[in-house]
Amino acid sequence: MAFQTSCAAAGGINCPPDIVADGEGRELVQHGSALFPIACYAEDVKSYSVAWHWHEEFEFIFAVKGPLTVDVNKTQLVLRTGQGVFINSGVLHAVEQAESGNALLHSGVFHPRLVGGMDTIFWQKRIRPLLQPGAPAFFLLDSGTAWQREALACLQDAWQAVADEPPDYENEARYRLTTVLRLLGAQCEEGGGVKVSQQEQIAAERMKQMLRFVEEHYAEELTVERIAACVALSESACLRSFRQLLGITPIQYVKQFRVEKAAELLRSTRLRTGEIGAECGFTDGSYFIKTFRELKHCTPKEYRQRFEAQ
């Protein structure tokens, strides 16, 4: 979730939205419209992160100025300038700045039906291969390989078309994205991309259930035991699952989730800091401020002031 963003918005480009997720961590933000289900984002990053989430849409991220860290399931990617990643539908992922300094990213989130509905040849030939069981979770894109270079160029062209909105830009963006899906589909046939094993898929689905439990109970006292019990795991197995998939402990995730909820309330309400902390599961006001500062690099009061000053 972006904090104190400096958004390079123009034309059809948006500032990245705050991640609003349902109980399984699935993002609920609508990207684009029902008629044209794509949205493109630009972000000049100072202190930037996108919490763990997933959505039905495909997503591409391009590092205009790196480095950026993109976590996809159990894999951590560092995107250098000029590199990109295409993330498949339904895959857990998160984004953060890799090093101190500024990073600029361009990203796009689009629903598969932008290319064609399920009853079209476009779905059967271009989309279905990517949605099959065992399909790659993501494709790392680098200009050093011919097909990846073409894919990156098409993604940037699609992004720019949505940004500038020239005549017939919808068709241009759709054409470029269809080309990308053709390239990715060919890689699926050749065994390319980073695939997810059945065991990893089971672990990811179990993680979604645990994220849902945190979403539903974050205002209550939460322990590793309670989180583990929601999927019939032992505490040690729960800890191992979080560390392997998210790189953090369950309680660290709970803290991050509570802070993001608190940040949302600081932006959208006039509740006092203490009230917000209590609503988000922090029983001690001083601990809330300390935890918020650790994760957001400012106090809740400063966060609200900076948001209001934008």
Explain the meaning of each model-derived region.
Residues 121-176, 212:
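Amphipathic alpha-helical segments enriched in hydrophobic/aromatic residues interleaved with Lys/Arg
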Residues 183-190, 209-260, 267, 271, ...:
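Basic/polar phosphate-binding segments, predominantly the helix-turn-helix DNA-binding elements
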Residues 1-84, 90-91, 124-125, 135-139, ...:
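Generic protein-terminus/edge-of-domain signal
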Residues 48-54, 96-98, 118-119, 169, ...:
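Short histidine-centered beta-strand/loop micro-motifs
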Residues 90-113, 120-122:
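Ligand-binding loop in jelly-roll beta-barrel domains
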Residues 170-191:
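Hydrophobic, aromatic-enriched interface-forming segments
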Residues 165-172, 191-200:
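Hydrophobic/aromatic-rich alpha-helical bundle segments in the mid-to-C-terminal region
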